[in-house]
Design a protein with these regions (language model features):
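Conserved PLP-anchoring active-site segment centered on the Schiff-base-forming lysine
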Residues: 83-102
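Active-site phosphate-binding strand-loop segment of PLP-dependent enzymes
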Residues: 116, 120-168
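Active-site-proximal loop->helix
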Residues: 86, 104-111
Length: 168
């Protein structure tokens, strides 16, 4: 957490929610990484920018998660831009919260999936969109967890209940 007026708070307006960027252990590890790997990449990963530290972390994440493989992205924007296109096709549908982050919206646009948008955190509208998309092979509900523009939190229990009910 970060401290504001003497009170520990979660900083939801930055990518450093918990204030770990200034934590002594993180700083010490960053200094060690600079000594071992230098500063910056020679290029983007798919050309020649992958270092052993990336491979090591991806393997450790795969072992921890029990997955065949893992890929790291340099930003959430890049991750969202690369996700939807790789898992969805024209016979699929994405049902997206109206206030989703721009990176989610752009990622969905890059996919060839049918697109539906439900009113922010409105479970009745989400259910209506799930019904409208019922002919799709796969229906994927896309939502932020915490919405960066207004700080609201997704109704994950409600979304999960509707996803289960509509096989999404």
């Amino acid at each position: 957490a970060v401290t504001v007026a003497g009170k520990a708070v979660i900083n939801l307006c930055a990518n450093n929610y918990l204030g770990l960027a200034n934590h002594p252990t993180v700083l010490e590890a960053a200094h060690a990484a600079l000594d071992d790997f230098g500063f910056g990449m020679a290029s983007v990963r798919f050309i020649c920018g992958t270092q052993t530290i990336h491979d090591t972390l991806e393997k450790k994440l795969s072992a921890f998660l029990g997955t065949e493989d893992t890929i790291l992205y340099p930003s959430c924007f890049d991750a969202n831009g690369g996700l939807f296109e790789t898992i969805l096709g024209p016979e699929d549908a994405v049902i997206s919260d109206a206030l989703n982050h721009a990176s989610i919206i752009d990622g969905i646009r890059l996919s060839k999936a049918q697109r539906f948008r439900y009113q922010h955190n409105d479970m009745q509208d989400l259910e209506q969109k799930l019904i409208e998309a019922s002919s799709a092979r796969t229906r994927l509900i896309a939502t932020d967890g915490v919405f960066s523009m207004d700080g609201t939190i997704a109704n994950l229990p409600g979304i999960r209940e509707l996803a289960d009910r509509h096989d999404a």
